[in-house]
A protein has these predicted regions:
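Hot-dog-fold acyl-thioester-processing enzymes
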Residues: 1-63, 125-128
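HotDog/MaoC-like acyl-thioester-processing domains
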Residues: 69-78, 82-128
Length: 128
């Protein structure tokens, strides 16, 4: 995660929070430095799994629950993700689709868990 990743995300989402942008302000916080925007972190944790899990098969995200940020992310951190399938079922309203519940875990380079969420998606089914 780069400093520019964080700055650009904050700018694009109109989030001027000093905790993400102001180095002087952050020197006096419990972190001692700027932290990466948590929604960027969550997006990254989910996004890096797409190539291995859902590329070209997602029809839409239906919701997220149990979102937690367990440790801060700092500029220069390296993030990796693990995704588990919690549940899958047929869609009641769309016979060509299924509902899949994913559990996403994000870790930094020290193997500390940095983020977690449960996400439900509307997914394409394989043709019968």
């Amino acid at each position: 995660v780069t400093e520019m990743d964080n700055i650009m995300f904050c700018a694009q989402t109109h989030n001027p929070q000093p905790l993400h942008l102001d180095e002087e302000f952050c020197k006096n916080t419990m972190y001692g430095q700027r932290i990466v925007n948590s929604l960027f972190t969550l997006g990254l944790v989910i996004g890096v799994t797409v190539g291995d899990t859902t590329l070209g098969t997602t029809l839409g995200n239906l919701g997220m629950t149990d979102v937690r940020f367990k440790n801060p992310v700092f500029h220069g951190d390296t993030i990796r993700s693990v995704t588990k399938i919690q549940e899958k079922r047929e869609s009641k309203s769309r016979p060509d689709s299924g509902i899949v519940t994913f559990e996403h875990f994000g870790f930094n380079q020290r193997n500390e868990e940095i983020a977690y969420c449960i996400r439900t998606g509307l997914m394409m089914k394989r043709p019968a």
